[in-house]
Regions:
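Short, conserved catalytic-motif segment at the N-terminal edge
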Residues: 30-84, 100-105, 119-122, 128, ...
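Active-site SXXK
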Residues: 52, 58, 80-113, 188-196, ...
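Short, glycine/proline-biased beta-turn/loop segments that scaffold the active-site neighborhood
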Residues: 106-123, 215
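Catalytic loop of the DD-peptidase/beta-lactamase superfamily, centered on the K-T-G motif
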Residues: 2-8, 16-62, 201, 246-496
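Stable alpha-helical elements in mature extracytoplasmic
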Residues: 30, 34-37, 50, 86-87, ...
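Short, surface-exposed loop or secondary-structure junction motifs
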Residues: 122-324
């Protein structure tokens, strides 16, 4: 009977995995057009909805919306969505415009604009504090780290999570630095504050007068309250979605809080990769747009808001990430006059670091090669993980319920003297397992700090990836409860 109870959960897991492997899949094996790719993969990847725009040969070749937002309202290509960390490319464009107009210099200490920041001590990753003022170039290039705890005025309630690099090795190297993380989400908020100080105008007014109005981006703004019908963001939980009704704070605009649409971003990206002859915006002529995606340092990986990765295949220029309820991925190919942008009403580490990059990669294959292979069906894997997790929880609940019989049987071994060593090993294993589970739960925010470069609360851990975070946390806690109940029963039985 005990053996049967032991193998039943594993049999259920095997059945679920086999069903997932052999059930018919959706869509063709290969995609040859953008519409079938994004229509099918939205379902296969478990994404609530997204807007897509693609620039090819300097023209807007594709612009469509699929799915729905957190409240299941259908998305359209003109539905406003939060841009998240990709807001940096618009702030970077403003900075470039100010530099071109000689209103500001990149190598000037930021304390010249905001004296309160004069005491800010910056340092390179793994190095001691730099004995020099922090400059605007260093800030815009994410060149140095600085103590975020000393900047409460620039740290709103909602913080974005910048997407990782396309190469796994580069992703790990950039997200697990030797000491301090340089890509602070506060960097471009400070840049935005400096632009306001220099111009004596609000950031939202600068964005409108210098970028959005000249380019006809009428639904792009740093003042979300000025736009109606912004899509409600969503979170994900094992392939299912739930709505977020909480809005992103206004003061996050310069780095995380700009609202836009795929239609508007298509206009902006078209200007960036292939502006029409003579097409200018204040401080940025059509011939100057390549400045936007040139590294601010020769050995750097960041331009005016853009991230730049050099590889054997050439430069990979991108930006994106997640903020509560929303994610985005933007990639440009300036040498080919092409660009891809995906905006989605759903957040999470998985969607911003894996799913959206995968979809961009597939679209890139169609764009340049005419065909793309069908990617891995993530939603199916998430549903399998959800069922396995449920079975695991049920097994742990049963083990907690049967703690008395477990302790009684263990003490019988000891009383009969048949296996004293076995009893001791079981008790030691139970205690160590309990301590390890508690330690992992307590240290989870510390591990997240190493990953994202800033202190992370338990609430944020669950918000950025509800399925995985809640699964791991619940599994650890239920395992700890099981061990506690077993140890308590052993103590009670020994006393009686």
């Amino acid at each position: 009977m005990k053996f049967l109870r032991l193998i039943v959960p594993w049999l259920l897991v095997i059945v679920i995995i086999l069903a997932a492997l052999y059930l018919p899949d959706l869509g063709p094996e290969n995609y040859k057009d953008f519409d079938s790719l994004f229509a099918n993969e939205r379902v296969r990847q478990g994404i609530a909805g997204y807007e897509v725009a693609i620039i090819k040969d300097g023209e807007i070749a594709f612009n469509e919306a699929y799915g729905f937002d957190g409240q299941r309202k259908p998305l359209e290509k003109s539905t406003p969505l939060y841009l998240g960390p990709a807001s940096e490319i618009l702030t970077g464009t403003l900075l470039c415009q100010f530099v071109n107009e000689k209103k500001i210099a990149l190598d000037v200490p930021i304390a010249q604009f905001i004296p309160d920041l004069a005491s800010l001590k910056a340092k390179r990753s793994g190095a001691a504090s730099l004995d020099m003022p922090l400059t605007l170039r260093q800030l815009a290039a994410h060149r140095v780290a600085f103590p975020e705890k000393d900047l409460p005025d620039y740290d709103p309630e909602a913080t974005g999570l910048e997407a990782g690099l396309p190469d796994p090795e580069l992703f790990l190297r950039s997200h697990f630095p030797t000491e301090n993380y340089t890509r602070s989400r506060l960097s471009y908020r400070i840049v935005g504050a400096i632009l306001e100080k220099v111009s004596n105008r609000k950031y939202s007014d600068l964005l409108e007068s210098m970028i959005t109005i000249p380019l006809g981006m009428h639904l792009t703004t740093a003042r979300p309250s000025s736009i109606e019908n912004i899509a409600v963001g969503a979170g994900s939980f094992f392939g299912l979605t739930f709505p977020y009704l909480e809005k992103v704070p206004y003061d996050a605009a310069a780095s995380d809080g700009i609202v836009t649409t795929s239609e508007d971003m298509a206009k902006f990206l078209k200007f960036v990769v292939s502006p029409e002859r003579g097409q200018n915006i204040p401080g940025l002529a059509s011939s100057q747009t390549p400045l936007l995606y040139q590294a601010l340092y020769k050995d750097g990986d960041t331009g005016f808001g853009w991230r730049i990765v050099d590889s054997k295949k050439g430069r990979y220029i991108f930006q994106g990430g997640s903020i509560r309820g929303y994610s985005s991925r933007i990639v440009i190919y300036p040498e080919r006059n092409a660009a891809i942008v995906i905006l989605t009403s759903q957040d999470g580490i998985i969607i911003s670091n894996f799913l959206l990059p995968t979809l961009v990669s597939c679209a890139e294959q169609i764009l340049f090669n005419g065909e793309s292979r069908r990617p891995f069906p993530t939603q199916r894997a998430e549903l399998v993980a959800g069922f396995v997790f449920l079975i695991y929880l049920l097994s742990k609940i049963f083990q907690i319920q049967s703690s008395y019989s477990w302790a009684r049987d263990l003490l019988k071994y000891r009383e009969t003297g048949r296996s004293q060593l076995y009893v001791r090993l079981v008790l030691v294993r139970t205690i160590i397992g309990l301590l390890l589970r508690i330690l992992i739960v307590v240290l989870a925010p510390v591990g997240a700090l190493a990953l994202v470069g800033r202190p992370v609360s338990y609430q944020e851990l669950i918000a950025f990836e509800p399925g995985v975070s809640s699964m791991l946390m619940t599994a650890l806690l239920f395992g700890a409860f099981r061990n506690i109940s077993r140890l308590v029963m052993i103590v009670r039985l020994r006393r009686s």
